[in-house]
């Protein structure tokens, strides 16, 4: 797996990796922002001699629950608006990413608490059903 959008790093790694991962800040934390990035990675795969379908797509999404304070970090890039953790918002968003070819999603929860994790249960149930 590689988690980069730098041209040089993609050229070095894409001939060898089985998957590529995107961070939420790179695509604005929504499907519409992800699509041009996906297309860019598809082009980078072809330049590296790979079919885009050979490289699994994964990404991280920022999801807010009650008590969210924002994700403080040393990252200098602007942070996108978080996705509301309510299943009515989160389920269609996750399905949209699946339709866009994303095979695996990591949810970056804000806050990272037992309550936030438990609040994901209806979303998981809806996606599993």
Q: Where are each of the predicted segments found?
A:
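Active-site-adjacent structural elements that line small-molecule/cofactor binding pockets in enzymes
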Residues: 1-129
